[in-house]
Amino acid sequence: MASLLWGGDAGAAESERLNSHFSNLSQPRKNLWGIKSTAVRNIDGSINNINEDDEEDVVDLAANSLLNKLIHQSLVESSHRVEVLQKDPSSPLYSVKTFEELRLKEELLKGIYAMGFNRPSKIQEMALPMMLAHPPQNLIAQSQSGTGKTAAFVLAMLSRVNALELFPQCLCLAPTYELALQTGRVVEQMGKFCVDVQVMYAIRGNRIPRGTDITKQIIIGTPGTVLDWCFKLKLIDLTKIRVFVLDEADVMIDTQGFSDHSIRIQRALPSECQMLLFSATFEDSVWHFAERIIPDPNVIKLRKEELTLNNIRQYYVLCEHRKDKYQALCNIYGSITIGQAIIFCQTRRNAKWLTVEMIQDGHQVSLLSGELTVEQRASIIQRFRDGKEKVLITTNVCARGIDVKQVTIVVNFDLPVKQGEEPDYETYLHRIGRTGRFGKKGLAFNMIEVDELPSLMKIQDHFNSSIKQLNAEDMDEIEKIDY
């Protein structure tokens, strides 16, 4: 497959800049150890002063989506059960266990194996027969990062392309240009043996003059730019599109204007165009959007994985102030055998202060918070997974999706609360759910002040689980903790 293509010299410069952007992923993180000041050094060497950042980190759906793509570079084992709803319940339901069963072109099969795929993932087993069917079938699918979702729809696009026809035939919408580039990388890898198939980006910075004859068969872009290319610049003839993919639908509808742009594009597509929509979550708003944009679909859902607290022992420690919390943490840390730990703080200020304290006491610690770029976060998480640091201190940017088998302890240095001091039950669940995974037992400690006790009791009642008080000054009591 030809390299990913841009328009003209400006496009080449943009491509070079983006190659540099992604090469940062392999750069090692600067060492945090030995810091003796009230500042924390970022991954890029810049300094954050702990007198700043009282605000809580706001979870950015698009950034989280990109982060999950970067940290799930290979397939992950999913505990979800796949549920299929066919548009025609009487038709046979096919699944595959090998890629050979799909009767793919030889160059596509070679591309799949070159990417390291040995057999289809759970969602690929069910989705690929539908996506590659003749005549084409529309699909709405729920899928998390690491399940092979992007590879599945890229395979569908590459399978439908006629390399001899030099015009756009497949169109993929992504909510951000970074996510579009990630999809493009998969196209390039899987299509490396499809020498006459090319891809082009409809994203900001790639300016194409009106009336340009685009000969690339696959277009990947963001809704606003694609809309301009189709209706304003007349670069893409939507009546010739054979496959339309809308990726990250839950992120798309969270971005103002994108859902309207996507619907306008979809309405100009021919009735025989295959339409595929993917989303990590299927809340009501996503469902309503999906039903508006994908006609007569098959549906693949992941039966909801219930995070359980049954194998997590929960404790709380009453503290008077921040330093008291830190002393309690040190006592626990010195009395219990810990694999790896994640400590959650509500604000960047507390996260940075705690990082400095632990580093000065000789602990191997990394700090993860919202001011870091997505690539920097991915690098820190990978180092933590590799065991290069034993403690990860973070804000809510790490409350979901980070699965590390060695994590045995989660600490809420600050209790998660919503505005108005109401307990944030969902965040609490996902925070302490970082331990006790993969069938193992785990521990969760909540460092609270007296006025937070009513909120903690609400959490206990909400989950109908036991949260026991722990005297962190009684080392014998701590040592008796069994998990």
Curated annotation (Swiss-Prot):
- Stretches assigned to the Helicase ATP-binding domain: 130-300
Motif mapping: Nuclear localization signal:
100-114
Q: Motif Q motif residues?
A: 97-125
UniProt record, GO biological process: mRNA export from nucleus; poly(A)+ mRNA export from nucleus; regulation of translation; spermatid development
Q: How is it modified after translation?
A: Phosphorylated on threonine residues. The phosphorylated form is found in the cytoplasm but not in the nucleus.
Nuclear export signal, short sequence motif: residues: 61-74
UniProt keyword ATP-binding present: yes
User: What is the protein named?
Assistant: ATP-dependent RNA helicase DDX25
Its ancestry begins with:
Eukaryota, Metazoa, Chordata, Craniata, Vertebrata
